[in-house]
From Swiss-Prot:
Classification via SUPFAM superfamilies: Glucocorticoid receptor-like (DNA-binding domain), Nuclear receptor ligand-binding domain
Gene that encodes the chain: nhr-11
Residue ranges of DNA binding: 2-81
Protein name: Nuclear hormone receptor family member nhr-11
Family, per entry: Belongs to the nuclear hormone receptor family.
UniProt keyword list: DNA-binding, Metal-binding, Nucleus, Receptor, Transcription, Transcription regulation, Zinc, Zinc-finger
A molecular-function term among this protein's GO annotations: sequence-specific DNA binding
Biological classification of the source: Eukaryota, Metazoa, Ecdysozoa, Nematoda, Chromadorea
Annotated Low complexity bias: 97-115
Length: 459
């Protein structure tokens, strides 16, 4: 094991950086902070734990990480600004050019990145953004928070998560500016949480009408606070023989949900198509996970978005067992079961079980689902669309952070848990799409024509 980093305890601090012994990731963080003159604030009362083993632990609080950098002996005066680096490079190039003819392949004329600069992005999940004003916890604001103006060099970066994060709030020194008319949603006397809360309760009410026998009077009385479309008594056993995937009414419900997303109407036609398709996949995974956590986890039942359930204790056979065929009456049933059940088992093991352990509240679920949609769509949008995506993600992450740092909210560890869960949720959504493509290609399902169109869309 190598020498430990004085900041995050990584056993890779083989040399000194800026006067202190630290790893390349912490050195890159320190250099970027000083060079860009970034300011942070810690929302916790006690020093936050900074550790290399988990990315969320290393990045959970930039203010505390910066303090540890200074405690390790790192000095800001040893960090050269980008302007100084450019001047040095230009002088070096001029000297090289005076000694030899220019060579387009020579190191002096190529833009290169040092290992530390490369490490800067490989270890970073979230880019620093200029600070927005603190987002309110109470849903009694007259307008949603406006995004801040991004630095040009920062807005062009595209790391896996390039929004603000957790307890490190961006600096308030940056001036805020309103977006063009129609770019931001304008819901008076409503907060961002209320907005996504209303979207989700509306979707729950539609599913309750569609898939249960609940009276309309009850639905009208409870729709504003409906957090799950089903009760345990509403659930029906899943029948793979009649399963057709998503049907037309499912797409209608999600269409209404999608069009209510902030800035959706400002997307191009291609971006709207992309955004809607991502919502369909993310909703199936995340809503199933949430409904299961609320209704089926105690009975080890996987609850689907249409109110059907599958018993998962013990796990059903996948259909790939040696003697699996003898349990089915015909080859058609066997083929359909073998195509569908591995997909459901994978969703259960890879997403629903770990998500259920988080014990998310309905408010956390509303924000996390919207954030997952924005993140899943980000790299499929144009640069203009990505800018809108970054803006909306920053608003959600900022509010989620404030909510988790309220009394009893769990603090930075809770924020880290929720944000890290997006990794396996997005992966399951991608696998779900791939599985449906295969099911339609081989005509395993008698799918709705809308589902065929969704799966044939060219990204």
């Amino acid at each position: 094991m190598g020498p430990l980093c004085a900041v995050c305890e990584s056993p890779t601090a083989f040399t000194l950086h800026f006067g202190g012994r630290c790893c390349k990731a912490c050195a890159a963080f320190f250099r970027r902070t000083i060079a860009l003159d970034l300011k942070y604030e810690c929302a916790a009362d006690d020093p936050c734990e900074i550790h290399f083993k988990f990315p969320g632990m290393r990045l959970v609080c930039r203010e505390c990480r910066l303090r540890k950098c200074y405690s390790a002996g790192m000095r800001s005066e040893l960090v050269r600004s980008k302007r100084e680096n450019f001047a040095c490079t230009r002088r070096k190039d001029s000297r090289n050019n005076s000694d030899a003819a220019p060579n387009s392949n020579s190191p002096s004329t190529r833009q290169s990145s040092s290992p530390e600069e490369m490490d800067d992005w490989s270890f970073q999940m979230f880019e620093e953004k200029p600070k927005i004003e603190d987002l309110p916890l109470t849903p009694s604001i007259s307008h949603p928070p406006l995004p801040t103006q991004l630095m040009p060099e920062e807005s062009s970066r595209t790391s896996s998560f390039d929004g603000g994060y957790c307890s490190s709030y961006p600096s308030s020194s940056a001036a805020t500016h309103p977006s063009p008319p129609g770019m931001l949603y304008s819901i008076e006397n409503n907060s961002i949480l209320q907005y996504y809360h209303s979207m989700e309760t509306g979707l729950c009410s539609k599913r309750r009408i569609m898939y249960t026998n609940t009276g309309m009077d009850f639905i009208l009385d409870t729709h504003a606070n409906l957090q799950c479309p089903f009760t345990v008594n509403d659930l029906r056993p899943h029948d793979y023989r009649n399963f057709r995937g998503m049907l037309r009414h499912d797409f209608v419900m999600l269409f209404d949900y999608a069009t209510r997303f902030p800035e959706f109407n400002s997307f191009t036609s291609h971006e709207k198509n992309m955004f809607y398709r991502q919502i369909v996949a993310v909703d199936f995974i995340l809503s199933s996970a949430y409904y299961t956590a609320k209704l089926g986890q105690a009975h080890r039942q996987m609850v689907l978005t249409n109110g059907e359930y599958l018993n998962m204790d013990p796990l059903p056979m996948s259909g790939n067992e040696i003697d699996a065929r003898r349990y089915f009456d015909c080859d058609e049933d066997f083929s359909k079961y073998r195509a569908l059940m591995p997909m459901h088992i994978a969703i259960w093991e890879e997403s629903i079980v770990p998500f259920s352990k988080l014990n998310v509240t309905f408010e956390e679920f509303c924000l996390l689902k919207a954030l997952t949609v924005w993140q899943a769509t980000y790299f499929k949008l144009t640069e203009n669309g990505r800018e809108k995506c970054r803006r909306q993600r920053n608003i959600i992450i900022g509010f989620l952070s404030k909510m988790c740092h309220s009394p009893g909210g769990g603090g930075e560890h809770r924020v880290g848990e929720l944000l890290m869960s997006m990794n396996y949720l997005r992966e399951s959504a991608q696998k779900l799409t791939t599985s449906y493509v295969m099911l339609t290609v081989f005509n395993v399902l008698n799918c709705d024509s809308m589902l065929h169109e969704m799966l044939n869309f060219q990204y």
